[in-house]
Amino acid sequence: NMAAEMILSGDADIVVAGGMENMSMAPYAMMKGRYGYRMGNATLVDTMVNDALTDAFNHYHMMITAENVCDKYGITREELDEFSANSQQKCEAAIAAGKFDDEIVPVPVKVKKEIVEFKKDEGPRAGTTVETLSKLRCCSGKEGGLVTAGNASGINDGAAAVVVMSEEKAKELGVKPLATWVAGALGGVEPEIMGVGPVASTKKVLAKTGLTIDDFDLIEA
């Protein structure tokens, strides 16, 4: 959206929009270490949990927001596991078929004494089924909770970038667009149900464009 807005405003005609996430290397921190400790023990804080997965205002974990969404909309454990298994299986099939090979830039990674070419997403768990997911225990800490290590989002590292340019510049350079940006929107919801944020933004996009949800062939959720 920011790239498109820069182009629409005339501030740019080509923008590389990118982002990255490195959860596995998030450090542990001693929050008072900069100014020194007097006496007693110090506690190491997991910055991945504290800075990324915990609401800054209400201090609850992201897993609790997922539990809240389940409570609010009556989502069952069976529905969670079925959706998760289906998602894993689709991803596994897409990787096996090489659907994203042309979009992936292999990265050389040193593993022990060997250089390994990293080019496959490690996130999907091969052979995941509803049956295997149903055996996992809740990990959110909520009594009677539904969120498990199998139906929750994983701990991942990754990066992506896309080149966005004006139609005029694309024609000038002879570039064939892969897609056209039509509209974007931001939507805000209560932090305790943050998982439904895309619903609010999608409704705004539909209102701006006059489209309906049936006009979309693919929705990334």
Task: Cite the ranges covered by each PLM segment.
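Flexible glycine-/small-residue-enriched beta->alpha junction loops
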Residues: 4, 14-69
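Short coil/turn connectors at secondary-structure junctions
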Residues: 9-15, 44, 53, 101-103, ...
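Beta-strand segments within the central parallel beta-sheet cores of soluble alpha/beta enzyme folds
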Residues: 15-20, 79-86, 104-109, 175-186, ...
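Active-site pocket-shaping loop/turn-to-helix segments
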Residues: 1, 24, 53-61, 74, ...
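Phosphate/pyrophosphate-binding loops at sites that engage ATP/ADP/AMP, CoA/4′-phosphopantetheine
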Residues: 69-74, 170-174, 203-217
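N-terminal extracellular/periplasmic Venus flytrap/periplasmic-binding protein-like
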Residues: 79-172
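Alpha-helix C-terminal capping segments
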Residues: 1-11, 166-167, 208-209
